[in-house]
Amino acid sequence: GWRDWLKKAGGWLKKKGPGILKAALGAATQ
């Protein structure tokens, strides 16, 4: 169900979130 997906997404964001934010900020400032 979507709750399982949310749990997976939450765990993934905890691991990958900082890097994604840095990449997004880098792209936005270019």
Curated annotation (Swiss-Prot):
Pfam families registered for this protein in UniProt: Ponericin
Alphabetical list of InterPro entries matching this protein: Poneritoxin
Subcellular location: Secreted
Any single GO CC term annotated in Swiss-Prot or TrEMBL for this entry: extracellular region
Keyword annotations of the record: Antimicrobial, Secreted
UniProt superkingdom: Eukaryota
Ranges that cross the membrane: none
Cysteines joined through disulfide linkages: none
Claim: Secreted is one of the keywords in the record: yes
Tissue-specificity statement: Expressed by the venom gland.
Homology family: Belongs to the ponericin-G family.
Function in brief: May have antimicrobial properties, like most ant linear peptides.
Protein name: U1-poneritoxin-Ni3c
